[in-house]
């Protein structure tokens, strides 16, 4: 039983599993529902995918690669960049893109990320940099937040599907919450 931090091979397996879950769900979901917005201002599934793609590049694998390339030990002053997620989402305009292409883009990035994570050493986990909003982030911190982040957005995608099904449930709505 793991009671402490998740080791890199476990994180790599969880990252792979998240990608497989996303692929399975989006493959089954009809294309028109990829662009369904459950409420004004909420992301459609394609926008969630775009966010995951950008997070892979800018937030997780990207930051880990920067930290490793710098050889930065935690607290040495390596500055990590923040990014405006809403502005990036608007600029990407993923709602207008093909959902299958977004899934494939994420899958390719994720395969490289899984290899990166699987190859991390114990010494790599304590390396880090300083984020402008949250302060010190180590590779270990990023790995655990990555697992959490994936599941949060998988839940968001699944909730979008639930939101699309809800109005068509008739009396069965009484069995559950919207």
Predicted regions and their residues:
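Short, low-complexity, intrinsically disordered N-terminal peptides in bacterial proteins
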Residues: 1-9, 175-178
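Acidic/His metal-coordination segments adjacent to aromatic residues that form catalytic metal sites
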Residues: 3-6, 87-102, 132-141
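Short, contiguous alpha-helical
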Residues: 35-85, 114, 126-178
């Amino acid at each position: 039983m793991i009671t402490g931090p998740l080791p890199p091979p476990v994180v790599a397996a969880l990252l792979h599993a998240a990608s497989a879950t996303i692929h399975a769900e989006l493959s089954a979901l009809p294309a028109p529902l990829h662009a369904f917005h459950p409420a004004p201002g909420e992301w459609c599934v394609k926008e969630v995918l775009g966010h995951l793609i950008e997070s892979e590049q800018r937030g997780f694998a990207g930051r880990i690669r920067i930290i490793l390339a710098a050889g930065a030990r935690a607290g040495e002053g390596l500055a990590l960049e923040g990014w405006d997620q809403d502005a990036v989402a608007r600029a990407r305009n993923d709602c207008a893109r093909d959902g299958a292409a977004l899934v494939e883009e994420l899958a390719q990035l994720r395969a490289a990320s899984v290899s990166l994570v699987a190859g991390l050493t114990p010494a790599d986990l304590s390396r880090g940099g300083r984020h402008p909003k949250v302060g010190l982030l180590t590779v270990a911190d990023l790995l655990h937040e990555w697992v959490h982040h994936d599941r949060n957005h998988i839940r968001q995608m699944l909730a979008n599907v639930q939101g699309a099904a809800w109005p068509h449930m008739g009396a069965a709505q009484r069995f559950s919450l919207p």
